[in-house]
């Protein structure tokens, strides 16, 4: 902790600032999908040491990538009410120091990923390459399609977690990757609808801002249909035995479809807030259901 205080600006709590820099809630969800990906693949036949290495690798690569994203987006964050109190915009840590910490975490995380197996390393590296150069630098400020690319970065922890057990890509691993990617788009578009003025003021070309709120709802609705399809495909790949996944994922998806169909005729800010809150636990619940099915199938 003393070392951490040395790289932060005076007057701020080191743990709080680092938690803010690494967007700890979002990072925890990505770490959870990665660990659950490993558990889904292995059921009860996992290696505790691999699980520990994977947890460390996921934590460091996700923290490092997230921190670099915060460094590059600090100017945008300073313009939005929702984000202007983040660590860098409020002056709790400089961009240079934040970048240094983030790069160190990323490099160590990728090194540990490689120790697990090559495919876990590839997943971690792809997560960084998609999120930072492609999403943050090249497309976020230019096109509303940026979040579609960014979503695949968010799916890499689950993809890598699954391959930590299998040692190679599988159709099931791809299902997890794509499920996270499409969920993240539906989720963020409803966040944008709720915080519409913030995104408009910052000049970020998100779908609801560029094409209209109805287009944002329609885009989210299409992605939920894709999520439902992925649940059905996973059920088939599991030999028609993943009943918990089918019931949980099917119910949540159909409920979201019902809600979003109503929003095509208009959605209030409060309704958008309730919907993205409903979307928030979707991934965790579906992944837990998949793990239960994996255990029951043994």
Spans of model-derived segments:
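Hydrophobic alpha-helical transmembrane segments in multi-pass integral membrane proteins
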Residues: 159-169, 227-234, 282-298
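Membrane-embedded alpha-helical segments that form the functional core of polytopic membrane enzymes
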Residues: 32-74, 81-82, 106, 110, ...
């Amino acid at each position: 902790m003393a070392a951490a205080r040395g790289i932060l600006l005076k007057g701020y709590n080191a743990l709080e600032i680092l938690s803010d820099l690494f967007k700890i809630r979002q990072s925890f969800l990505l770490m959870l999908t990665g660990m659950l990906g490993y558990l889904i693949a292995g059921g009860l036949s996992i290696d505790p040491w691999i699980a520990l290495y994977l947890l460390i690798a996921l934590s460091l690569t996700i923290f490092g990538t997230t921190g670099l994203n915060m460094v590059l987006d600090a100017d945008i964050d300073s313009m939005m009410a929702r984000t202007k109190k983040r660590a860098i915009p409020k002056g709790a840590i400089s961009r240079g120091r934040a970048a240094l910490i983030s790069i160190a975490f990323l490099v160590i995380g990728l090194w540990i990923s490689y120790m697990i197996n090559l495919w876990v390393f590839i997943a971690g590296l792809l997560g960084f390459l998609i999120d930072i150069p492609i999403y943050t630098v090249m497309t976020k400020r230019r096109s509303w399609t940026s979040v579609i690319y960014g979503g695949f970065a968010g799916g890499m922890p689950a993809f890598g977690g699954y391959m930590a057990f299998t040692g190679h890509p599988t159709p099931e691993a791809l299902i997890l990757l794509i499920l996270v990617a499409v969920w993240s788009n539906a989720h963020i578009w409803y966040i944008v609808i709720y915080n519409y003025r913030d995104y408009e003021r910052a000049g970020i070309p998100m779908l609801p801002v560029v094409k209209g709120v109805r287009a944002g709802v329609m885009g989210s609705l299409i992605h939920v249909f894709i999520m439902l399809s992925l649940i059905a495909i996973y059920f088939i790949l599991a030999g028609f035995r993943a009943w918990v996944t089918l019931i949980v994922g099917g119910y949540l998806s159909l409920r979201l479809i019902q809600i979003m169909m109503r929003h095509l005729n208009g959605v209030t800010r409060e309704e958008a807030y309730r919907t993205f809150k409903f979307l928030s636990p979707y991934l965790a619940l579906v992944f837990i259901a998949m793990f239960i099915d994996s255990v029951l199938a043994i």
